[in-house]
Structures are given as structure tokens and as C-alpha cells.
Amino acid sequence: MATLEQNLQQMLQGSVEDLGCELWGIECQRAGRFMTVRLYIDKEGGVTVDDCADVSRQVSAILDVEDPIADKYNLEVSSPGLDRPLFTLEQFQRYVGQEISVHLRIPMLDRRKWQGKLERIEGDMLTLIVDDQEQSFALSNIQKANVIPKF
């Protein structure tokens, strides 16, 4: 069964691309009776405020017609930022060699949070170098991942 994020991704991706942007990812977070639906968009050269506004208007119209969210919600549209979240295998592959953080669904070695250099991806496993040691994680066990920006 597909998640709400997966359903929204499928529903909205084409419209976002028609506006010249990539739908980087979607997060849905519940807070009490309300939900926040957060869309991350990206494009070559960077995302502008006008891009976010255009995507927000387009997506709002689609969600009003399709009505896929049963609860009241707030829609947020933004760029992924420097510490961008990673949602897909392809996105992880773009950042091999860079520092990332991962939050696991099921702890490994009594830890849920890990940070290290993304060394490689093989199949559905990614390997980080953490404190000069290799640690491998199943993509299915990663709840959240972010790029650690270099300054």
C-alpha cells in the first residue's frame, strides 16, 4: 500500500515539472488535528521565491480538486536547502563522497542517528564511513537522511 507521500508524489510530479522544477521530495507531518504537507522543489540555478509561489498555486489547485488529504493541512513549498533531505536512491547516489546524517527506524548498535561520509551504495544498502569504520544500512531502515553542508 502506497504512503500519502508516494501518492502525492505521483499526483503532483508532472505539474511541478511542467513549471520547470524538480519535485525533490515530500514530507507529511501531523501535529494534532492538522497536517503539514511540505514539498521540496529544485531546479538548475536554484529555486526562487516566485518558483515556490507558482508551484504552491498549482499544487493547491490540484489538491483542492483531487482532495487526497482527509485532514486539514498547511501546504509549504521550499527549496531543499544546503542540508537537503535525501528521499530516493538516485538522490543518495548524487551525494556519494559527501557527509550525510541518517536517522534509522530500527536502531543499529543501540543508535538511531549516524553521521559520516557516504562511501558507496550497493543494491539497497548504503555504507557510511563513521569514525574510520564502515557502517552499512538498509535503505528501508532509513527514516530520514540529510546532506551535511560544508562551509
From Swiss-Prot:
Q: Name one GO biological process term.
A: translation
* One matching Pfam family: RimP_N
One Gene Ontology cellular component = cytosol
- What are the subcellular locations of this protein? Cytoplasm
Q: Which UniProt keywords apply?
A: Cytoplasm, Ribosome biogenesis
Q: Which InterPro entries match?
A: Ribosome_maturation_RimP, RimP_C, RimP_C_sf, RimP_N, RimP_N_sf
Question: Quick one: where is this thing mainly located?
Answer: cytoplasm
Q: What does this protein do?
A: Required for maturation of 30S ribosomal subunits.
Its family remark reads: Belongs to the RimP family.
Q: By what name is this protein known?
A: Ribosome maturation factor RimP
Species in which this protein is naturally found: Mannheimia succiniciproducens (strain KCTC 0769BP / MBEL55E)
Gene name of the record? rimP
